[in-house]
Amino acid sequence: EEAQQCIREYKPVDGLKKESKYEKEIEEYMDCLFQKNTKKAIALIRKYVDRGIDLDDIYVEILSESMRRVGELWHTAEITVDTEHYCTSVTQMAMAQMYDLLFDGARKNKTILSVCPGMELHEMGARIVTDLFENHGWDSIFLGAAVPVDYILDAVSENHPDLVTLS
């Protein structure tokens, strides 16, 4: 009940309103998150894959948009940090469930290195970008969060990626 109310009352911050052709899927997914139903949330994302929704659309239009809305709800104090972290954790699990599907296409012999430098702990954006590049044939080196700059430079020097992304 509380989850449904939170979703129904969702009003984007001015300038961030985004209409989506996947509004129904976003609402279903966020409902699972706010009900703290991990199993159902993961199954729902699998259902979207089985329905033939493109992985790019699942990542960008459904998962990213859901997380943007969750972040906005946290920012406006409509949800607490523990709920925001739970939603992030479940979304990371959902993404991991799709990981093997990212390698179905032809490879491009290109490499992306993605990292969150310094004290940046929020790695989901970098993970999404990295997975999208994998889905389009790139190999990836994902270093994760809070990596000191010297180690980033070492990784670039050792691996010679075609593209480096910082988040």
What name fits each language-model region?
Residues 1-104:
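Long amphipathic alpha-helical segments
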Residues 54, 139, 162:
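Residue-level detector of anion-binding/catalytic polar loops
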Residues 106-108:
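Short, flexible hinge/linker loops that cap or flank conserved catalytic cores
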Residues 111-113:
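Conserved beta-strand elements of the Class I
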Residues 117-122:
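Short coil/turn segments
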Residues 127-141:
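Short helix-loop-beta junction
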Residues 142, 147-167:
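Cofactor-cradling patches in redox/metallo enzymes
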